[in-house]
């Protein structure tokens, strides 16, 4: 393909992305854009970033051959990129460290974040403790109930957790509240956005920080199997773990990229969180233009997923663009399929995956039998499932 060079100076990925925010936030975003442009060209910043990833996060995360599961499926070989092994248990820490270092450079003493599953909240609270910053995390009240272990973790790490009671009480509402806080406290506060969405420059800088995932696997897979995988696959909510896996492969011919959205109770039911694969129209949410789940009047519709981290009505603008140009494809996996993959991964590989990651695992398990035994699917195992055991137990009628 032609050289891939996105976003443009205005933060557009084709027709998606951009900056659709209140005037009060423009100054903060311009400031962030200028600082990030400086940082991007500064090798000392990246040296510090990679030093932290190695010595604090424990990178590089390994690639792992899921042999027993692959054998049982009888087709393609399934490999995992083990982001679950990072400090704090998910890919979120890569982005949180990058943004916290940026905040420190900008002299900000207070950081805020939104969180769904709680993983980004934990990652933000972690880096705030690491760098001595005040931390406030906004979390939908519904998610606070679903993810009580992560709420307690954030508090242990010194963060203030604010339950958001408005709207559907999930991730989008937490994001709204975080943006309100930022508008009010823009001079002292840095907003550590948790996914590759939101207004420019967030989709770009988040992507740059999480691209370490695909950059590593691009080196690791040839060492492990002598070549690149046939398919790379990742779950997509806002889309940060997926863009971190995909971006380094965009210009690599022959590597298929598949993003797996949350099919909830099935796309036909309307109770899902799959804006791209369900053919949702384009709209603006949280400062950015993307495919967006909305009704005929343009009102955001309530989403559903068994996984709190995928329960979001929009998606990062770069994914919309990759879909439109045909470089990546997007599919959905429903709650039941994801839960089945969750249990299979536990039983066959001794790894408890996050429910988010289980969507990507389920798609891999679904297609592997129809592929050749010499073909390879690399799944971004974006996080571990300790945080989800209450949810999974509850669905099985078990009280912990």
From Swiss-Prot:
Keywords: Amino-acid biosynthesis, Aromatic amino acid biosynthesis, Lyase, Pyridoxal phosphate, Tryptophan biosynthesis
MF terms (GO), sorted A to Z: tryptophan synthase activity
Cofactor requirement: pyridoxal 5'-phosphate
Positions carrying N6-(pyridoxal phosphate)lysine: 92
PROSITE patterns: TRP_SYNTHASE_BETA
One cellular-component annotation, GO: cytoplasm
Keyword set includes Amino-acid biosynthesis: yes
Coiled coil: none
UniProt-listed SUPFAM superfamilies: Tryptophan synthase beta subunit-like PLP-dependent enzymes
This protein's pathway: Amino-acid biosynthesis; L-tryptophan biosynthesis; L-tryptophan from chorismate: step 5/5
Enzyme Commission identifier(s): 4.2.1.20
A Pfam family the protein falls into: PALP
Catalyzed reactions: (1S,2R)-1-C-(indol-3-yl)glycerol 3-phosphate + L-serine = D-glyceraldehyde 3-phosphate + L-tryptophan + H2O
UniProt keyword annotation of Amino-acid biosynthesis present: yes
Family to which this protein belongs: Belongs to the TrpB family.
Subunit structure: Tetramer of two alpha and two beta chains.
Protein function: The beta subunit is responsible for the synthesis of L-tryptophan from indole and L-serine.
Protein name stated in the entry: Tryptophan synthase beta chain
Species annotation: Chromobacterium violaceum (strain ATCC 12472 / DSM 30191 / JCM 1249 / CCUG 213 / NBRC 12614 / NCIMB 9131 / NCTC 9757 / MK)
Higher taxonomy: Bacteria, Pseudomonadati, Pseudomonadota, Betaproteobacteria, Neisseriales
Recorded name of the encoding gene: trpB
